[in-house]
């Protein structure tokens, strides 16, 4: 058995807890306590000689000091080391931006959870006096020796050597001796003495706001097998010239500091994305101790915290600390729900920087799992009670859920599963939390519209403009600035600060008799336990958002003005009572009710299927709507009886932290009401290519103006060119001509079909009895097998035409609108349709459901495209020539009915159009491709040749240059259509009638196809 190696003069085995030093001569190891070498002094030794080697080689050699050349012998151009005496001297003399630009200075009684919710805990807060903070501290006569008495002199602590910016271990008793020694060879700083488990903890109580916000205080279970994170109480003992370099507190925690004695100077940097990126690069650089991070950012603020003052630094702020005089302070770190996303971001930065465990938040991921479970309970409880969470809680829940998904991925799970509590079902928690968040977001998108501060409140006064250190008798008011999008882009006027305080003071006087003076107290982490309500002259007033949730018309622009005669705003006082500033007239109330109804009707369209709330596959984003229509975006497959947000109507209700003043109201609107609301909305707009394609294909939209919405009018120049072409072709433009009759049939059929569909109910297009609906019922979807293949092909080709109807074109290119999507069928070849397809574009997440139509784009008058006019003229000339040739060949053709079909419109042309799902330019029904294996394409194309729609530029280009001879519903480009199809008809007809020899190169179908392909590939009019 091998013997255990022993070291040092004491000949004991290695002990990891004891400091040891190696002799540079004999290479043996010695305990520092055995040879008289302290750990903090070992860094100054260049060559160490043990007691045995000291006899032969002399004493240990110390490092040469360069302090004698402080002022005049300094090397020029050499950077200063962070923490050195020269660095501290230069730092003291530098000028920084004043922190008064960013920090808030409320009184202790004003600093409540409600204050942080309204003002957002995103900037530092300096409280000049501890009164009202609910904090317990020792008397100012408390000293470092008293700390040693309550903690114990044998307590091992972490001490920072400021000159080296390195950490070392030291007993508290030894540090106290150093602190009171007359000559300090080094600058030592104690900033991480956590005393929660010592007797000193009985003398210090954290601020009330910290106790209410802290996750550890409120959410950490007592029976948890993981060790409870103790980061709430720290004692900081710093000597003069102590300096802590720039850092973010572990886990993105917020921090509070109270200076009991002395002074501390904080250098603060805002945690913007750019600054965080710079900080990460600076922290990972090899010469970090030679660069002052404050020089790399745009602004670095200086904040002095003097004796008796308390500073709260929010999540993510990058800060450094300088101690100008000996200082004794208390502080602590805490995680909270006000900025969860930033906390997670700071945690990820720590992981990327490979921060040591000593400087990390203990069990950070464990507490996050508990918080995720708690937020889920909050969402469920608020929804069951018809209340709504605040925006910071929704954003925090989303950030947590994203982190949970990342931590539980298969490749990352081994690194994170050790911190997952056994009581948490991770997969179910992620799914339920995503469901609740989606419910909350959908409720507001369906009823209120997209706005950044619907869930929460916002501060309206910039930092420093109105001091928050007003006397106790003044009333502080904060208002939510709702910037809902309106039609004219205007925003509601804000209140002047003077008017706000005047009104608030009057209301405060009226409610001062309701109870004793005090503050409203909340517990953020326990939304179901209510604190006692108190009111008083210093109570906070908050605007109820009733009347501000709709901003759809111009007459709302001046409603926020307090000087007006009508104002729907009400002050919600701290006791829950609602006091209305001005009486709202009946006409104004009627306008508000009307707008609420109209918004509700548009938002709650009838959907064919139920919304699967437990499925993440139903999420869908449609980015083709413009900003002006963003507030009318309808989410697909939403439940029919969806709870709806409405302003709070109970004046005595207590608002919980993490909640806004809204109630949920169940929806009992009938389908008849919805049809009226949707038709009224659709009647105000006009169609455009892209959105109406989906509406027509899914057969969900009907209305009296539907036919007018489906086709954009041609420009005057195009219409003149078409008329000229018809005249040159000897075609009459009266109603008897095939072109006019076919166009008239299409228009009349579209009108009759749309009127019939609107009378039968929303979502039906065909006038057949099978598609009729009764009021109050859900729309009946037609089964896929009701449609044959020819109908699907017609629908596909019609959608292709309509999708390009509103696009600008010239002879060579098509110019789609900016709103066109990559999946637009007009921009790529359409794949073969399935029988059960509802003609909706493929989406990786969901099926696309009807959206609202776009507005008409103005047609540019007087614009002419030379290539188009040239093509029209050439096509018209060839048409006239072909008509003459056809008249000469009539006597040789036996099939007289075929020519009648060409020259005269058939009486049944208007009938098949009635059953088409969308307006079409075709006037002849397609034969069933399944029943007719080889349909004669040429006569069918001839019947379409006289249609006015043949000469409009709505043909969809084939991506592969294939001839579209068999697709009657998709007209070709003007030049190609007229020069190639008619000769083939004549040759084929004459060949069938008398066996006349065909033209050279056009004898077989293959030759004719090759001729057409060549024209497609090289023709000037190729689209």
From Swiss-Prot:
SUPFAM superfamilies assigned: Clavaminate synthase-like, FYVE/PHD zinc finger
Region (Linker), start-end ranges? 65-79
Subcellular location, in the record's words? Nucleus; Nucleus, Nucleolus
Where do the annotations place substrate binding?
A: 244, 264
Q: Which residues are in the JmjC domain?
A: 195-351
User: Can you summarize the PTM annotation of this record?
Assistant: Phosphorylation at Ser-33 and Ser-84 are required for dissociation from chromatin and accumulation of H4K20Me1 levels during prophase.
Record carries keyword Kinase: no
**Cellular component GO terms, alphabetical:** nuclear membrane; nucleolus; nucleoplasm; nucleus
One Pfam family per UniProt: PHD
Role according to the record? Histone lysine demethylase with selectivity for the di- and monomethyl states that plays a key role cell cycle progression, rDNA transcription and brain development. Demethylates mono- and dimethylated histone H3 'Lys-9' residue (H3K9Me1 and H3K9Me2), dimethylated H3 'Lys-27' (H3K27Me2) and monomethylated histone H4 'Lys-20' residue (H4K20Me1). Acts as a transcription activator as H3K9Me1, H3K9Me2, H3K27Me2 and H4K20Me1 are epigenetic repressive marks. Involved in cell cycle progression by being required to control G1-S transition.
The protein's name: Histone lysine demethylase PHF8
Q: What organism is listed for this UniProt entry? A: Mus musculus
Q: What is the lineage of its organism?
A: Eukaryota, Metazoa, Chordata, Craniata, Vertebrata
Gene name of the encoded protein: Phf8
